[in-house]
A protein has these predicted regions:
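Internal metal/ion-chelating core segments
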Residues: 170-252
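Membrane-embedded hairpin module used as a gating/binding unit in multi-pass transport
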Residues: 218-296
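C-terminal non-catalytic interaction/assembly regions of soluble proteins
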Residues: 98, 304-436
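Short glycine-rich or small-residue beta-strand-to-loop segments that form or flank ligand, phosphate
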Residues: 72-83, 108-115, 289-292
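Glycine-rich phosphate/diphosphate-binding loops that line cofactor/substrate pockets in enzymes
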Residues: 58-74, 99-105, 280-287, 313-314, ...
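N-terminal glycine-/serine-/threonine-rich phosphate-binding loop
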Residues: 33-68, 275-276, 299, 311
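An acidic, phosphate/nucleotide-engaging active-site surface
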Residues: 119-188
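N-terminal amphipathic/basic leader segments beginning at the initiator methionine
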Residues: 6-53
Length: 436
């Protein structure tokens, strides 16, 4: 999808697949940011980085010092939607538990998938690797959020019922492995999210997520005062998660850095480090934001760039969202629901009451939340979607405008907004826009 040049101001670009799209801004548009975060290289030796983190835990004794002979241990790891190098981390953790007197036959592995689809045994084997699959033969389980034997362990201080996987509830020592990345509602992923939503029941996750998803402080790059995050911490504490290993991972799925230790302490440091990599400061809210989904361009992941753009665009402004949508099958149910006349708030109320549309029930709760966010974006902004993978009719069902070319989209918006403060995010899929 090439750019188109005209008699305008200087050229800019966004990343699109393996190419760059050049474009020109109208002369009445004032650029307030066009920062493109450079790629961050991975460490030379991922296993060495894992060992370093485990040898120097933050706010916690080492795993070897937490473990006692006779303990039953639950090792929690994230699902196939995350690039976390579980196959490297788990053998090292198993070896440390062995040295502390806990044999493999007293250790279970649990895939903390939240409400995502349950993986097959072969998919679990791919995630944990041959060695761990063999060592924990018959003791690697996917969490089932709908299981009748999930265990109620209490309520958060705000009243959310916390119901978790029985193998976690009845273990003596619980250790988690995951990834810390910017998260649009929890501030950052990682930490206690391995528990909530990771191993919680569907009704617990629905109660938490649907209740707090639109709170003003439920947003990226905010932990203190973020009710969505604070409820996750409450659930994690109730679960007794003792130790967490979180990774910062780049676009090439390489380990940048690992953090380990107390689930709150290590997550704070991991979040701070992640923010240092991805934050783009803005002096004001933009009238127009031009954002590319790159590098998260596949399926529902492509929506992250649009959500982030909403944080830094003024109400009534415009967002130009650029995404190839070459594998768009996974967002078709979202598009179908967007075609209804129901407002964001009315749809949200349905979810709170447990009335989830039948065609969305097989999807995870985070997917269903996207419908609310998209409806809200369509109500709050003029969104122009630049794509080649969706038809104009499909884009219009989302209440967005369609364009096949970026320069054409800019021209459309500039007709109604000849003067505007503009933010450009060439790689909008992995940024944290922060308005000062």
């Amino acid at each position: 999808m090439p750019g188109k040049k005209g008699n305008m101001s200087m050229a800019h670009y966004v990343n699109y697949g393996n190419e760059k799209i050049d474009f020109l801004l109208p002369k009445g548009w004032n650029l307030i940011s066009a920062e493109d975060k450079p790629p961050v290289p991975g460490v030379a030796d991922s296993l060495q980085e894992i060992r370093r983190a485990l040898d120097h835990p933050i706010g916690s004794p080492k795993i070897e010092d937490l473990a006692r002979p006779g303990m039953e241990v639950a090792l929690l790891f994230d699902d196939l939607q995350r690039p976390t190098p579980v196959h490297l981390a788990l053998p090292e953790i198993l070896n440390r538990l062995n040295r502390a007197g806990i044999p493999d036959n007293r250790i279970s592995g649990i895939c903390s998938l939240g409400t995502h689809p349950i993986p097959t045994l072969e998919q679990l084997k791919k995630k944990v690797g041959e060695e761990v699959f063999s060592r924990l033969q018959g003791r690697i389980f996917p969490h089932d959020p709908h299981a009748s034997d999930n265990v109620i362990i209490g309520r958060t201080h705000r009243g959310t019922l916390v119901e978790i996987n029985p193998r976690v509830a009845f273990s003596d020592l619980i250790i988690g492995v995951g990834e810390c990345m910017p998260h649009p509602t929890a501030g950052f992923g990682g930490g206690y999210k391995i528990i909530m939503p990771g191993v919680c029941s569907y009704r617990s996750v629905a109660s938490h997520h649907f209740t707090w998803m639109r709170h003003r402080n439920s947003k990226v790059n905010l932990l203190d005062g973020n009710s969505f995050y604070e409820e996750i911490v409450d659930a994690g504490r109730l679960s007794r998660l003792a130790f967490k290993l979180d990774f910062i991972i780049n676009d090439k799925k390489e380990v940048i850095r690992a953090f380990a230790g107390n689930p709150i302490a290590e997550h704070r440091e991991a979040s701070h480090y992640s923010a240092s990599l991805y934050t783009i400061p803005l002096s004001k809210l933009a009238d127009v934001t031009i954002t590319s989904a790159f590098p998260l361009e596949v399926g529902v992941q492509a929506t992250k760039a649009l959500t982030m753009a909403g944080f830094c665009t003024r109400s009534g402004g415009a967002i130009i969202w650029v995404a190839p949508q070459k594998e768009a099958g996974s967002i078709m149910p979202l598009i179908k629901e967007m075609g209804s006349s129901e407002s964001a708030s009315d749809f949200h109320r349905r979810l709170i009451q447990g009335d989830v549309p039948d065609h969305l029930k097989s999807f995870g709760i985070s997917y269903i939340m996207q419908v609310v966010y998209f409806k809200e974006l369509a109500e709050k902004f003029r969104v122009v979607h630049v794509t080649e993978g969706l038809s104009p009719e499909q884009v219009k069902m989302m209440k967005f405008s369609y364009s096949s070319r970026l320069q054409e989209a800019i021209n459309q918006v500039s007709e109604k907004m000849p003067k505007a403060d503009v933010a450009v995010f060439p790689s909008g899929g992995n940024i944290i826009p922060e308005v000062k």
